[in-house]
Regions:
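Acidic, Mg2+-coordinating catalytic module of metal-dependent nucleases/exonucleases
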Residues: 243-273
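Short, small-residue-biased leader/transition segments that mark boundaries at the very start
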Residues: 1-5
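Class I S-adenosyl-L-methionine
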Residues: 13, 22-28, 91, 283-294
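Conserved AAA+ ATPase "SRH/arginine-finger" region at the nucleotide-binding site
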Residues: 9-15
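A residue-level signal for conserved active-site and pocket-lining positions in enzyme catalytic cores
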Residues: 10, 41-43, 94, 145, ...
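Mg2+-dependent endonuclease catalytic cores in nucleic-acid-processing enzymes, primarily RNase H-like
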Residues: 103-246, 267-268, 281-282, 286-294
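Short beta-strand scaffold segments in enzyme catalytic cores
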Residues: 92-98
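ATPase catalytic-site recognition across NTP-hydrolyzing enzymes
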Residues: 16-86
């Protein structure tokens, strides 16, 4: 006869030594951090605190994270959007996405990280890494390159006319990838754009966001990024123990998500931002002023 055995988390209460159990339980009960207490006292390693101060409080892992999404949804014959964040610590970050406008679905397919230990936290190296990945995926649908508008600024180490986006498009080349840069003219106001992203997580105008479960850093941002009182992101810094470099632990991949939604769902973004019904708003000159491509 077959037995059905279910995995159950092991906790302090399973320890047969009663005296030890009582002392240990009393010590664990003094822990203030609820997440740590849940994990150590109850063996609940999947516990994620629903934090009222989390800025993306409409994100719901059970609803928005999908196992095997890239394998199910990615279409190499359709345009792929790559969204770039140019911070070098703790890593450089790229999100890849495709949007099904007909069914109002945003597919976040993959996060690609340029880590310092692999010397990939610079634009040329990460662009080469992404190019190789696109070749391996046999991508023929064209590639959009978007992200932080400040990436257009010329670095002091570069010549005139060279910036992060020209480096990416030059690396992708003039062949099969056909890169196009598409950017907002300036960064969308942080508090407003975070409210907008929350609304989209909640189904604003029928939109649905699906994120491949392998996007671990993005998921961490969505769970742990805290909100300042003015509605902006709390950009707390932490120090790398090896290098002594200070960096923002959370927010780089969620910034990519913000830029993606504000540019590619811009009808909804303008409507949300204006507080109106959006009718006729997007055909005004604000589109020309705020979004451009070259």
């Amino acid at each position: 006869r077959q037995m059905c055995i279910r995995d159950r988390p092991f906790s302090v209460f399973d320890n047969p030594n009663i005296a030890f159990r009582q002392v240990y339980e009393a010590a664990l009960n003094k822990i203030r951090d609820q997440a740590t207490k849940e994990r150590l006292l109850y063996g609940n390693w999947d516990f994620v605190e629903a934090n009222d101060m989390a800025i993306y409080n409409s994100f719901d892992g059970s609803r928005h994270l999908v196992t095997g999404l890239k394998e199910k949804a990615y279409d190499p014959t359709k345009p792929l959007i790559t969204v770039w964040d140019f911070n070098v610590a703790p890593q450089m970050s790229v999100l890849s996405a495709q949007i099904d406008y007909e069914n109002r679905k945003v597919y976040i397919l993959e996060e690609i990280l340029g880590k310092p230990e692999e010397k990939e936290n610079n634009t040329p190296a990460l662009a080469r890494k992404v190019r190789l990945k696109l070749y391996r995926d046999k991508h023929i649908g064209g590639v959009d390159v978007t992200g932080d508008p400040s990436g257009l600024q010329r670095s002091t180490t570069n010549e005139d006319g060279i910036n992060n986006y020209t480096i990416i498009t030059d690396t992708f080349g003039r062949g099969i990838l056909r890169p196009k840069v598409k950017l907002l003219r300036k960064q969308p106001p942080q508090a407003t754009r975070c409210e907008f992203v929350n609304e989209v997580f909640g189904g604003y105008e029928g939109w649905e966001i699906q994120i491949d479960i392998k996007c671990r850093k993005l998921t961490q941002d969505l769970i742990y990024q805290l909100r300042n009182e003015d509605g902006t992101k709390s950009k707390q810094k932490t120090t790398d123990p090896k290098t002594g470099v200070k960096y923002e632990r959370y927010g780089h991949l969620s910034d990519c998500l913000d830029y993606l939604l504000c540019y590619y769902l811009r009808d909804s973004w303008y409507k949300f931002k204006s507080g109106g019904d959006g009718n006729g708003y997007v055909v005004s000159t604000s589109v020309i002023q705020e979004g451009f491509s070259y």
